[in-house]
Amino acid sequence: MRYFLLPLFILLFTQAFSQDIQQVEVIKSDKQVTELFDELGDKEIKIDVIDLLAQPALNIGYEKINDSYSSFGADLYLNLNDISSADSWAEKISLNPFYRFYFLNKTDFGGEGYFVEAFLKLSYLHYDRDTYYYGPDPGIPYYESEEIKTFDVAPGIGVGKKWVNRKGWTFEYMIGFGRFLFSDFEPEATFKGGVSIGKRF
């Protein structure tokens, strides 16, 4: 009897365990992912809340989801600070097209999880440049202030992460850096990043 009960117990346990496994689907197929983000929409509008609260500046973005693994879009940055403000960036207006590659945490909705972004900043810069000079007495320097207005281009790369809920609301953070190509006088490096809230449609 003992030898009969042991195989029976193993059989029942295995069947119950198999039923549990069948009820849990850990990874969705690409077709299911596509259906889910088609239901939510494959376009997204977002706004950077850090720029809005801290600068003030307006940074709005648009993103088009290609598939589960990639997207492209652009964001527009408008600096609302006065150029004399200590908090102001040199960039007054910036249009930033980008292309993203999503990886690791690709989940239900596509275009979600960790990403790497390649971007190109097309920037109009407006700032005051101070040039210091030394006369006969090196202990008494003097300087000239010059208002600079110029246009420049900065390629760059960034990393970040995005979350999407079942209502289509998105939350993301990102940090990236680029380098201006042409001018010798403006800041050589440029920053791109922030914390954004958006909506799929």
What role is predicted for each listed range?
Residues 39-53, 71-82, 173-181:
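Transmembrane beta-strand segments that form the barrel wall of outer-membrane beta-barrel proteins
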Residues 41-43, 54-58, 89-95, 112, ...:
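Residues that define the transmembrane beta-barrel architecture of outer-membrane proteins
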Residues 60-64, 97-101, 118-122, 155-161, ...:
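Residues on the lipid-exposed face of transmembrane beta-strands in outer-membrane beta-barrel proteins
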Residues 1-37:
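Cleavable N-terminal export/targeting peptides
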Residues 77-92, 122-151:
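Flexible, solvent-exposed loop segments that connect beta-strands
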Residues 20-26, 101, 189-201:
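Outer-membrane beta-barrel "beta-signal"
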Residues 35-42, 68-69, 87-89, 104-113, ...:
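Short loop/turn motifs that connect adjacent beta-strands in outer-membrane beta-barrel proteins
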Residues 80-84, 105-107, 124-130, 165, ...:
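Gram-negative outer-membrane beta-barrel proteins
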